[in-house]
UniProtKB/Swiss-Prot annotation:
This protein's UniProt keywords: Ribonucleoprotein, Ribosomal protein, RNA-binding, rRNA-binding
GO molecular function: rRNA binding; structural constituent of ribosome
NCBIfam families documented for this protein: rplV_bact
Keyword Ribosomal protein part of the UniProt annotation: yes
Extent of Low complexity compositional bias: 168-194
Family: Belongs to the universal ribosomal protein uL22 family.
Name under which the protein is recorded: Large ribosomal subunit protein uL22
Organism in which the protein naturally occurs: Mesomycoplasma hyopneumoniae (strain 232) (Mycoplasma hyopneumoniae)
GO annotation, cellular component aspect: cytosolic large ribosomal subunit
SUPFAM superfamilies in UniProt: Ribosomal protein L22
């Protein structure tokens, strides 16, 4: 079961001609900032990735306002992700007919915006859904029935989880059968002991 978070707005940009290492130097400055503060930081950061992130944040803000109805003042940057893209391999001629390799790296950018209002309620819904999935799993159902048997309790009938009282009846019947077998063995041992004692007295 997948719980969708409607408090997030995402914008992505792929195959940009910049290395992921250089772009991440700018990405670390944006996480957790408000949109207005992030744009101000990018305006005063003289890096190649700054205009790329500015374009991407503006796109994410437009998605948040048009698709989700968020307010611009409540938006914060939850994540600024930079992944490596395909690398273009070229060569440069060198002396004596040799050649050296040139790696033209690319990167994929992604910006995730979150709304400050309603984030806690969404996290609570996700946690409740996760708890329901864990409680209704068959492994937890079987473990609960076994724990009740160990304590000597009879599990209640639960049609949703498939727990039935037949399981407890079977276990009770097996335990009673074992007890009767032990009692029979004890009586047999007592009879043999009395016979041996009588034989010793006769001798």
């Amino acid at each position: 079961m997948k719980v969708e978070n409607h408090n997030l707005a995402v914008a992505s940009l792929k195959t940009q001609r910049i290395s992921a290492f250089k772009a991440r130097l700018v990405a670390v400055l944006l996480k957790g900032k408000k949109v207005s503060d992030a744009l101000a930081i990018l305006a005063h950061t003289k890096k190649k990735a700054s205009p790329i992130f500015t374009k991407l944040i503006n796109s994410a803000v437009a998605n948040a306002i048009n698709n989700h109805g968020f307010e611009h003042s409540n938006l914060i940057i939850k994540a600024a992700i930079v992944n490596e893209g395909p690398t273009l391999k070229r060569f440069r001629p060198r002396a004596k007919g040799a050649a050296s390799q040139i790696l033209k790296r690319t990167s994929h950018f992604k910006v995730i915006l979150a709304s400050q209002n309603g984030g806690e309620s969404q996290n609570q819904e996700y946690q409740e859904a996760e708890k329901n999935l864990v409680s209704k799993s068959p492994e937890n159902t079987q473990s609960g029935a076994l724990s009740q048997q160990i304590r000597g309790e009879q599990p209640q009938n639960d049609p949703e989880n498939g727990v039935d009282s037949q399981l407890s009846a079977k276990t009770n019947s097996t335990t009673t059968a074992k007890k009767t077998d032990l009692a029979d063995n004890n009586t047999k041992n007592d009879a043999t002991n009395t016979v041996l004692a009588q034989e010793k007295e006769v001798k």
